[in-house]
């Protein structure tokens, strides 16, 4: 058990008790009510306790790609830099990159993430060791080639079986077709069928740039969401669509009808000059917006608090509307909405929810005065957290990783980068 004493919880000084991996009780809890020998007691004095953040779109091993290709557009970034480096990937490199990325996420308050990448056994190994929660998809790209399509689907299905057989509630599977401009109708059809067979979500890039939209229009005569909807890609599945920057009214209507979850990546979209997602329109149509960092190659960090702030600010400016996205809405994008998208029973601090939460020391200049903490968490916090609990276990204590030797990870990451870069 874990007992947090005297923390600011939901705006009040309270205690919180964890039994197993569940928040059992919130309120005034005496130490005499629990067994001292079986309970870890956390002093929450001067701390605010918040739900863990949920990163709904990333490529965690790309922590090793941080800073390799800045200040260029997406297609040049992909074809000229990222894809050539990814051709050198191996299990050791992906393992090192995932360790580095998950440490970065945990130390900035993220307790769960939704990933699309390669060498899933290495990702799973690192996730298991760090203690973070994850939904993982093998990234499928067939480039309209039948032989490659069969290989990609085989690997995706094997990955789902591998994750299923882990029987680990922290690690769940998904299907990750890259995007409509890199995936054939056949692989997308098969993706929907597999998602229904395995009862897993689909994670796909959609409408990130004008160039990719034009590619789909030239090939099919209609826009990406219209194209996928024409053959039932969104039917009877939970779909998380990353980016969604350039959307027509008809596409927004499809998204609304099909209950699409949007993984909004404001920082990556700005850095690659892709554009700004019409989030206000999405909200007006009751479309659920969540937040992702994307990979470190296009961000260049995995601090979801930066995405929360960017989401709260950018739409005010673009729409000349100070309440386009409020601080409360932006915070829920990164917590409650993300948890719902990944079907995780978290995102709020309530009895019966999973014990995925974060403690932040408020004795910092940028978090003072403490009376305005809800505002500070969105507009002034830098993301450095003190304690992180995931699935009822302490994984970060006083800013230090509990399960992992950080110095060793940094050495592994430097070695892996040299192998990638040469």
Swiss-Prot record:
Residues that hold substrate according to the record: 86, 178, 208, 294
Catalysed reactions, as listed in the record: 5'-deoxyadenosine + H2O + H(+) = 5'-deoxyinosine + NH4(+); S-adenosyl-L-homocysteine + H2O + H(+) = S-inosyl-L-homocysteine + NH4(+); S-methyl-5'-thioadenosine + H2O + H(+) = S-methyl-5'-thioinosine + NH4(+); adenosine + H2O + H(+) = inosine + NH4(+)
Record text on cofactor binding: Binds 1 zinc ion per subunit.
CDD domains associated with the record: ATZ_TRZ_like
Enzyme class label: hydrolase
Pathway of action: Amino-acid biosynthesis; S-adenosyl-L-methionine biosynthesis
Miscellaneous comment in the UniProt entry for this protein: SAH is a product of SAM methyltransferases and is known to be a feedback inhibitor of these enzymes. As a result of this inhibition, organisms have evolved efficient enzymes to metabolize SAH via different pathways. The pathway found in methanogens differs from the canonical pathway, it uses the deamination of S-adenosyl-L-homocysteine to form S-inosyl-L-homocysteine for the regeneration of SAM from S-adenosyl-L-homocysteine. 5'-deoxyadenosine is a radical SAM enzyme reaction product which strongly inhibits radical SAM enzymes.
Quaternary assembly: Homotetramer.
Family: Belongs to the metallo-dependent hydrolases superfamily. MTA/SAH deaminase family.
Protein known as: 5'-deoxyadenosine deaminase
Gene designation: dadD
């Amino acid at each position: 058990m874990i007992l947090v004493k005297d923390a600011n919880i939901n705006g009040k000084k309270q205690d919180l008790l964890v039994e197993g991996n569940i928040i059992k009780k919130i309120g005034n809890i005496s130490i005499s009510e629990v067994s001292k020998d079986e309970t870890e007691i956390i002093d929450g004095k001067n701390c605010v306790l918040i739900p863990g953040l949920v990163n709904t779109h990333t490529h965690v091993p790309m922590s090793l790609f941080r800073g390799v290709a800045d200040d260029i557009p997406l297609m040049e970034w992909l074809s000229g830099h990222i894809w050539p480096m990814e051709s050198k990937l191996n299990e050791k490199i992906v393992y090192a990159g995932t360790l580095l990325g998950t440490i970065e996420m945990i130390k900035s308050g993220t307790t769960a993430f939704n990933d699309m990448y390669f060498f899933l056994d290495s990702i799973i190994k690192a996730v298991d060791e760090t203690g973070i929660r994850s939904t993982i998809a093998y990234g499928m790209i067939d480039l309209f080639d039948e032989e490659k399509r069969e290989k990609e689907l085989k690997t995706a299905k094997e990955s789902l079986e591998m994750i299923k057989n882990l029987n680990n509630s922290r690690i769940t599977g998904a299907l990750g077709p890259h995007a409509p401009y890199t995936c054939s109708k056949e692989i997308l059809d098969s993706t929907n069928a597999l998602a229904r067979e395995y009862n897993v979500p689909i994670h796909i890039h959609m409408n990130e740039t004008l160039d990719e939209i034009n590619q789909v229009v030239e090939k099919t005569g209609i826009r990406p969401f219209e194209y996928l909807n024409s053959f039932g890609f969104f039917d009877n599945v939970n779909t998380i669509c990353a980016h969604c920057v350039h959307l027509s009214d008809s596409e927004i209507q499809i998204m609304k009808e099909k209950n699409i979850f949007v993984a909004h990546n404001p920082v990556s979209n700005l850095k690659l000059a892709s554009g700004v997602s019409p989030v206000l329109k999405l909200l007006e149509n009751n479309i659920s917006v969540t937040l992702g960092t994307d990979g470190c190659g296009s961000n260049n960090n995995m601090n979801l608090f930066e995405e929360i702030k960017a989401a709260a600010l950018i739409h005010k400016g673009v729409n000349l509307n100070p309440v386009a996205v409020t601080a409360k809405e932006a915070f829920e994008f990164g917590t409650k909405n993300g948890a719902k998208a990944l079907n995780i029973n978290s995102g709020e601090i309530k009895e019966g929810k999973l014990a995925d939460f974060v403690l932040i020391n408020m004795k910092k200049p940028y978090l003072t005065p403490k009376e305005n903490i809800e505002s500070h968490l969105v507009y002034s916090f830098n993301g450095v957290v003190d304690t992180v609990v995931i699935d009822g276990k302490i994984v970060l204590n006083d800013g230090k990783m509990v399960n992992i030797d950080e110095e060793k990870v940094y050495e592994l990451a430097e070695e892996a980068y040299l192998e990638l870069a040469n």
